[in-house]
Amino acid sequence: RLFPEIWDFPLIQSAYNRIASIEKFLYPRSLKVLTKRQLEALESEVMSDALFMLEVEIAFAILMSAVLKDYFKLQPQSCFGYSVGETSMAFAQGIWGNFSEASKAFNSSKLFSSRLSDSKDAVREHWGLSKEQNLGEFWRNYLLMADVSQVKEAIKNEQRVYLTQINTPNEIVIAGEPAACERVINNIGCNAIPAPFNHVIHCEAMASESPE
């Protein structure tokens, strides 16, 4: 509502239909005020949907970039992105094409529905686990407040723990088998919390998906 002109910009037009669908899920409508429990359930549903989270970040990047570039006329001299930010940056700067078409490709692929999320078949195959076996929660991500060198040393003997992100020299994300990750945390003796997302990112266990 603050920047109505952006809806006429080509980049926004290319993404409008998908952004409209995302917005309805991100900001649910109700004739009654939702309870705290209902809101928490919706938040949990959103956080567990890796593809939806990816598309939300891309959509916001496109919208904010349109406001800054086309409304305020601020043109970047360079751009970079970290993790999903790299994908968001590429769409927001028009390096990659039509977001709505890309969204259709994302949603028709098994990459985010079963390969890296939900049943996590890529991990099962990498670890030699049966797809039919009910393993419960066999993958988890953790945020550690620890020195990166400590973490690298601590995971050397753990075959199912991966260092997935180095946010800062003292803020690290590891992922893998929960029991093995917790051994690493206990051995280091650092503060750590489970990450709010549970999909597979940035590690050897998803190497089979690189071609896609």
Where in this protein do the model-derived segments appear?
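Short, surface-exposed "cap/lid" segments of acyl-processing enzymes
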Residues: 1-28
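Acyltransferase
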Residues: 38-212
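Short, glycine/acidic-rich hinge or "gate" loops at secondary-structure transitions
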Residues: 29-39
